[in-house]
């Protein structure tokens, strides 16, 4: 699996980030495309054949999705590496940002497809870590964590908590070429994934409210 460096929501894009518009949103609304972008961002330029092997798909499928990503501006051909027999691709950006409520309103189906693709990608990343956990050095096994804390918050409090957590994470060294160059011995990639999952109770929503969150659901905690 891959690390797509997706930020479905965020207050401000970082340097060299793709800020999604309608075209980009639709282009990334597919798990394979998210994985392809993630592989190119993590490992650098590659070919459709090599990427297909990593993802367990055929090279034709990988080539098709790479062309779609290229048309949307997420990847581009690496002319310095390519030749007449093989096309090499590289990522254009290091991360993706999506924080446009108006766009989400205009493109509800594409928005949901994109978010579902991100969620599926995160699930596979967790599963990969679990599969590799027993073979990790003990020091790294001891850092592994999956936790959840059910809270009762207002929307304003939830937003404030999100900002506080983001501020904590950004104090640490990012997984970028610059970060790798200054990292001490023993530093490895660590993925920190956050989920804020509103679960409004049906009885707590005003009678005239509608839309996501106004119905009942199944308790998970």
State the predicted function of each range.
Residues 1-28:
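N-terminal leader segment of winged-helix/HTH proteins
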Residues 26-32, 47, 76-102:
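Short, cationic-aromatic polyanion-contact patches
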Residues 34-38:
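Pre-recognition alpha-helix immediately N-terminal to the DNA-recognition helix
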Residues 50-53:
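A short acidic, leucine-rich amphipathic alpha-helix
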Residues 73:
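Glycine-centered, phosphate/nucleic-acid-interacting loop/turn motifs that mediate DNA/RNA or nucleotide
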Residues 90-150:
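Amphipathic alpha-helical dimerization/coiled-coil segments
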Residues 135-221:
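Charged, low-complexity intrinsically disordered regulatory/assembly segments
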């Amino acid at each position: 699996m891959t690390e797509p460096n997706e930020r479905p929501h965020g207050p401000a894009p970082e340097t060299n980030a793709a800020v999604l518009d309608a075209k980009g949103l639709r282009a990334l609304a597919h798990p394979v495309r998210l994985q392809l972008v993630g592989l190119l961002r993590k490992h650098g330029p590659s070919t459709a054949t090599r990427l297909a092997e990593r993802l367990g798909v055929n090279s034709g499928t990988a080539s098709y999705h790479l062309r779609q990503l290229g048309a949307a501006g997420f990847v581009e051909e690496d002319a310095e590496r390519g030749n007449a027999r093989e096309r090499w691709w590289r990522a254009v950006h290091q991360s993706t940002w999506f924080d446009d409520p108006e766009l989400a309103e205009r493109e509800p189906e594409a928005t949901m497809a994109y978010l579902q693709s991100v969620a599926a990608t995160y699930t596979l990343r967790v599963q990969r870590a679990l599969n590799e956990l027993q073979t990790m050095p003990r020091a790294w096994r001891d850092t592994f964590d999956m936790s959840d804390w059910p809270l009762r918050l207002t929307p304003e409090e939830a937003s404030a908590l999100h900002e506080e957590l983001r501020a904590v994470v950004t104090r640490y060294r990012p997984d970028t070429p610059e970060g790798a160059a200054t990292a001490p011995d023993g530093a490895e990639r660590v993925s920190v994934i956050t989920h804020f999952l509103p679960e409004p109770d049906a009885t707590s929503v005003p009678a005239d409210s509608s839309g996501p969150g106004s119905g009942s659901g199944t308790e998970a905690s």
